[in-house]
């Protein structure tokens, strides 16, 4: 980033993410790299760029949007699960390396969120029924719905508060 254009960053939210739903043995190395580049390498690069100014100021907050896929695997999302698992560990590592400088790094690991990435799993079937995975999510979620991107605003805002030191 160009510091003169955006100024000093106190709070960084690494929220970019992509997914390619391809069985691992059908996925090319380039497709795997594309997912890892966006979901893991980009947060590393951006965090690395802002941490020195956070150290200089004596504080900073980094919030990484991870995924429940950092904890479990599922068919056709090997690159995504690997990248989000790596992001979870990068989050922990940033805490270990830079916590002494009052830089807090937290990860939010949401479940399934209704985004363009999950649209294929929410589409109605030709017979009008729900996609089997959509039925599964609805039946296993206490709110009986997919999460919305707005659902992440509260946790992110909480973690960004200056009073919070976790």
Locate predicted features.
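Substrate-binding pocket helix/loop in short-chain dehydrogenase/reductase
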Residues: 23-24, 31-36, 137
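C-terminal helical subdomain
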Residues: 107, 131-164
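Alpha-helical segment proximal to the catalytic Tyr-Lys
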Residues: 52, 96-100
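Residue(s) in the substrate-gating loop at a strand-loop-helix junction
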Residues: 67
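Active-site loop immediately N-terminal to the catalytic Tyr-X3-Lys motif
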Residues: 22-26, 72-78, 100-101, 144
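Active-site helix of classical SDR
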Residues: 47, 83, 91
């Amino acid at each position: 980033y160009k510091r003169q254009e955006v100024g000093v960053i106190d709070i960084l939210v690494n929220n970019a993410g992509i997914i390619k739903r391809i069985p691992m043995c059908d996925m090319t190395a380039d497709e795997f790299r594309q997912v890892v580049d966006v979901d893991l390498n980009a947060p590393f690069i951006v965090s690395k760029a802002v941490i020195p100014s956070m150290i200089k100021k004596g504080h900073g907050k980094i919030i990484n949007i991870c995924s429940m896929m950092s904890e479990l695997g599922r068919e056709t999302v090997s690159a995504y699960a690997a990248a989000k698992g790596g992001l979870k560990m990068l989050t922990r590592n940033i805490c270990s390396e830079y916590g002494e400088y009052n830089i807090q790094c937290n990860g939010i690991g949401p479940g399934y969120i209704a985004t363009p990435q999950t649209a294929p799993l929410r589409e109605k079937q030709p017979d009008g029924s729900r996609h089997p995975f959509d039925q599964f999510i609805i039946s296993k979620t206490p709110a009986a719905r997919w999460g919305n991107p707005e659902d992440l605003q509260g946790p992110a805002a909480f973690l960004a508060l200056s009073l919070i030191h976790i």
